[in-house]
Amino acid sequence: MSKQSVAQVRALLSSITDPQDPRLAEFKDDPRKGVQAALNQFAKRLEKRAEARAAFLNRFRYENQLWQAGHQYVAGIDEVGRGPLAGPVVTCAVVLDSQFDLVGVTDSKQLSRHEREQLYLRILDEAVEVSLAVSPAQEIDRLNIYAATQTAMIRSVKALHHQPSHLIVDAVPLDIPVPQTTLIKGDQKSISVAAASIVAKEYRDHLMAIYDRLYPGYGFKDNMGYGTAAHLAGLEQLGACPIHRRTFRPVPDYVN
């Protein structure tokens, strides 16, 4: 029978990652309800971790298939910022290798700000290569949002030091002479596209925080350019600023 206190057992269980750890057998024979409750929590943590690992490996299937087909340099492409009334579209291209093991990487919209910030730094450190590109509001107004997004995505691919032999693109096919796999909701299906979505999101959020200081009164650091009540109130009071998209309603109503 375990001689540790329930609190000590709970602390030990929090550090165990191997389901075959011999200490677990001892804890299972411990009749104390607190120990058994801690074991149940431990089992649930292991199950959740296994599910996360399985989902991670599933999101790696497109990359693995392409590597096995001989495409050593595969880039995942995603964008952030198609819907806001203000600010640029930001696109990112990320190249990973088979050693990449950040299980938490998934669609940036499913992550908390803290999770994104942590993963962003890890992706920059562990990816083979990362490149970013932007399409500013003026270009969006000139081309339309879809064409501007395509243009920025192509820029992010061309900015890579080594040109990829295959692209995995979130939803938007690109007019570029590189073989492509286009995935609807690609940031939920491909790990490299998910990594690109995280980097693009963090970079754009940082830009919008800078714009918030340059153009106060619209709440850009909080709404990221989306049409929130505070943003619309700022438009009503101040009119449109240089980063507003003049072709996105209701912005034209506030252009001086």
Swiss-Prot record:
SUPFAM superfamilies, per database record: Ribonuclease H-like (SSF53098)
Cellular component GO terms held in the UniProt record: cytoplasm; ribonuclease H2 complex
Keywords of this entry: Cytoplasm, Endonuclease, Hydrolase, Manganese, Metal-binding, Nuclease
Pfam families, per database record: RNase_HII
Domain RNase H type-2 positions: 72-256
Residue sites binding a divalent metal cation per the record: D78, E79, D170
GO molecular function, one term: RNA-DNA hybrid ribonuclease activity
Family annotation (PANTHER family): RIBONUCLEASE H2 SUBUNIT A, RIBONUCLEASE HII
Lineage: superkingdom: Bacteria
Catalytic activity: Endonucleolytic cleavage to 5'-phosphomonoester
Annotated localization: Cytoplasm
Keyword Acyltransferase: no
Protein name stated in the entry: Ribonuclease HII
Cofactors named for this entry: Mn(2+); Mg(2+)
Family per record: Belongs to the RNase HII family.
EC top class, as a word: hydrolase
PROSITE patterns: RNASE_H_2
Gene name per UniProt: rnhB
Annotated cofactor note: Manganese or magnesium. Binds 1 divalent metal ion per monomer in the absence of substrate. May bind a second metal ion after substrate binding.
E.C. number: 3.1.26.4
General function of this protein: Endonuclease that specifically degrades the RNA of RNA-DNA hybrids.
GO BP, sorted A to Z: DNA replication, removal of RNA primer; mismatch repair
Coarse class of the protein's main subcellular location: cytoplasm
